[in-house]
Regions:
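N-terminal strand-loop-strand
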Residues: 1-16
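Positively charged, solvent-exposed patches that mediate nucleic-acid binding
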Residues: 66, 80, 103
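A structural microfeature
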Residues: 2, 48-51
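Charged phosphate-binding loop/patch that engages nucleotide di/tri-phosphates or the phosphate backbone
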Residues: 100-116
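Short, charged/polar surface micro-motifs in flexible loops or helix N-caps
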Residues: 8-10, 23-24, 70-74
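C-terminal structural segments of small proteins and small subunits
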Residues: 74, 89-103
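The catalytic Nudix box helix
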Residues: 17-49, 88
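Active-site-adjacent beta-strand/loop module that shapes the phosphate/pyrophosphate-binding cleft
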Residues: 43-44, 52-76, 85, 108
Length: 116
């Protein structure tokens, strides 16, 4: 699932993997489940760890940690993104991804190739 950042947001128009910030006392999977509920209105069971990336965005250092969603319930809602789209990992390469997400997609695709 890719989510397009809204017009008033940082990196507006770029596509990203949904998620958000880890709050104090949360694990990464707990934070992702909470953020998916807040942003998309779904209840997600978080699966396997995919990888991590750091990206310098101006003065900010962005640290991303990607996890698979094993399953979810509920209907997707566009609460803070301008669009949502289901794509294969290969199709995702054709979208204008936020720069910090690009290495995570490449890592996921490489890992899938190794497991086949």
């Amino acid at each position: 699932l890719l989510a397009q950042r809204g017009a008033g947001s940082d990196q507006a128009g770029l596509w990203e993997f949904p998620g958000g910030k880890v709050e104090a006392g949360e694990s990464q999977p707990e934070a992702l489940a909470r953020e998916l509920d807040e942003e998309l209105g779904i209840c997600a069971r978080i699966g396997n760890y995919v990888g991590s990336n750091q990206w310098q965005q101006g003065e900010r250092l962005i640290r991303l940690h990607a996890w698979q969603v094993a399953e979810f319930s509920g209907e997707l809602q566009q609460r803070c993104h301008s669009a949502l789209v289901w794509v294969t990992p290969q199709q995702a390469q054709e979208y204008a991804l936020a720069p910090a997400d690009v290495p995570l997609l490449a890592e996921y695709i490489a890992a899938q190739g190794d497991s086949r």
